[in-house]
Amino acid sequence: MTISRYINKGILFPVYKGLYSTVPIDSLNPLEIGKAVIHRYTYLTTESVLSHAGIISQAIYDYTFVADISKRVSVGHWSFRFRQLKNEYLHNPLGILNQNGIFVATTERAVADMHYFNPKYHFDIPENIDFDKVRLIQEEVGYRHARS
């Protein structure tokens, strides 16, 4: 059978270009979708992680990742934003956790990443940030030298 027949019979559900699921899109984990649609190494960071940690209080509508390309993707009712990060920074594992196959930045790595993209970014609750760890990550990853 061809893919279109599987779709017509309800066996496969189209998710994104060349990506299909055996369950309806609404039943999927949005972080898994975000990881899959980019087809390259990526990790969840910046606004998504900072909002979850209570560091920023504004509503976040996109799942924010970094990758080696910049891209915006919508799948179902979810939106994904991929910010481009140089490979030398992207592939540095400091402050990146593997949570069930999805790479997620720690709060401190997300702050360091945000400062890389926007050095003047305002954090609503900065007292919840360990800035010593942030500075260490910035030094180790190389961010401190990137924007000098």
Positions of the model-derived regions?
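Basic amphipathic alpha-helical segments that dock to polyanions
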Residues: 3-14
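Glycine-rich beta-strand-to-loop/alpha-helix junction loops that act as flexible
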Residues: 16-19
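Nucleic-acid-binding surface
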Residues: 21-148
